[in-house]
Every structure is written in structure tokens, then in C-alpha cells.
């Protein structure tokens, strides 16, 4: 019951009903509207603290951007610019989750991320490594399988289904997770696609992604698949889910060049337009280039952090083979060690692998495919033999790669 001008005082703050707007009457006491508002704030902060403690989030222990980048350096070679952007973005995102309910009415907005870079430059690895560092639910989604409602393929909500599955259906944990949407460039708007069996232009999928990126409560089918009326749904609030999108955006260099009024090739190539580095046009990428490529403005606006990944040069590819904590060569050495065999690689073998990765234009992702082809026979035969050491020589590597289906690697 609400009372007014009865002479009653708030049992919490002692104010009379004449000093406040409302006085709520209970069985054995009274509470004013101001104490109700304050109690609501205390409850919200307490519930947020409980949820954060379950996920190990605390402002004092939250890794700083330099700590995040140092961890990334252990697993990802190069790409310092992208690492810095990601480290700051992730740090600010989780500070936002730790924000207390205050009176200043300053609400920190979510900053989703889009990474542009050629295949094999480390987009997926960066996102996966950050999720590993923070120990939060993480899932990778291929944008090419997503379709708008009514077409064959996966619904947009399947993204959240996968995140829920990774989080063991802990909704609170999933609502603070990270989603990496790969191949985001493949759903760019295209007007010349005649298909009638799926989303024709890609714009429908982009429109469907908007509600996830901006933050809204989405009803998710727990086991995935299409929705039907009698199915039980799980409501998931996406406002605190960090979305990282990645794509190769093949051909976007021409869009950048057009904007900079610089031709990439041709008789009209400009020698020097504001000292533009035409060998790495990606460093000049801007949101308007993504729009020209086919992403709708609403999608671009909900991914305010745009960063690029440089093409990997020979030195970077060589370091990827040996330097990271879980480098390719270290993984094979560990596998052989489990069989009691000491494995080693000659230096010229590693140079040969890099040569082939560059020749096939596979980037870092192709390094493993090449090494796997070289190592297949010895991994099959050695466990049954009594050998305790094995050295991969250049002649052996060449012979094994010639036996392998090289065209398959080149076309992968």
C-alpha cells in the first residue's frame, strides 16, 4: 500500500512521508521511493558481482592491454597493429562488463571488431588465443552457411546455439563470451547472384546479424536447427557478447585504390599519390571501403573497430614454423616424443616448406598442410619400428612432397 501525509517515517532512512514522493507500507514497517531505488541499484550490483565472480572477472585482476598482447605474442607471429587493437578492445569490453551502476548515467557501449586480411594471416588464431587467455566461452562460425529465414541453411540464431553449447548451456557465461564470425566478406551484397535456393544477395543475412551485434534478447533453440512453434526456447541477451568478424575481402584493394585515386595496375597508374604504398593497400582500409565492397552501413556501424592484418613475409612464415609456443615443428616433435622418438628438422627443410607455402599462396595455414604431407609416411611407419631418432632432411622432404598430391595443396 502507498501512503501519503500520514506521518509515517521510512524504516530505512528515517524520512517522513512529507519529505519523499512515495511511502510504501509493509506489515511491520515503511520504505520510501528513494530507498527502493537505492536497494534496486544494490541488488543489480550484487547480482553482477556474483556473475562476474563465476567467470573470474575482476577489475583488479583483469589483464591489461600490454598483458594481453604479450600473451598473443607467444602464439601469433607478427601483426603487431592488429594485436594492439584487439588487446585494447577486449580490455575495454570486459571493463564495460565490470561497470558499476552509477548516477553519472555514462553507459559504455560495446565495440565489436572487424579484422581484414588475406587467408592464413592469423585472424582466427588471434581470436582463439584471446578467448583462451580470458577463459571465456568462445565459438567460431562460418558466415557462408548462414541464410536468412526461409532459405536452406543455418539460421542466424545458430550462432548463439553454438555459444551455449560451448558454455554447457550456462546462459550467464554465454552472455559474456566471444563469437568469431569468419568469412564475413562472403555475405557482402551482390546483385548478380541468380540463386533462388538461398539468400540471393547476402543482405538478408547481414540484416539478421544486426540484432545480435547491437545487443538484444534473442530466443535460441537449444539444439539448433529451425524454430517451430512448440519448441522450448532459451532467451539470450547479446548486449555483452563480443563479436569479432574476419574476412579476406579479396579485391578490396581496388576499392581502396579508387578512394585514394590510385590505380593498382594499368597504364594510368599514379607514381606517387601522397606516398601511397601500393604493395600493401590494406593498411589504408576505411569503413567506406567495406561499404563499397558490399557490407551494409548498419553492419559497419555496429563494428566500430576496424583493423587489418599484413600479408606474412618470408621471415614471418619461417618464424611461425619454430617460434610460437605451439609452433608446427614443436607439435610434431611432441608427437614423436610420445613414441619415444627424437625428431629434428634440418634448417633447409624449413626454408623449403616456406618456399612452397609462398609458391602455393597458402599463407601460414598452408605450412601445416605441407609439413603434414612430408611427415605422413614416417608417422605411419615409425611407431612400428625400433628407431629412436629421425631427422627430416631436404632430400626426404622433396621426395615426400613429390609423392603427395601437390595439386590438392595448391588448390586448397
Residue spans of the language-model regions?
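AAA+ P-loop NTPase nucleotide-binding core of proteostasis motors
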Residues: 2-34, 41-78, 83-139, 143-152, ...
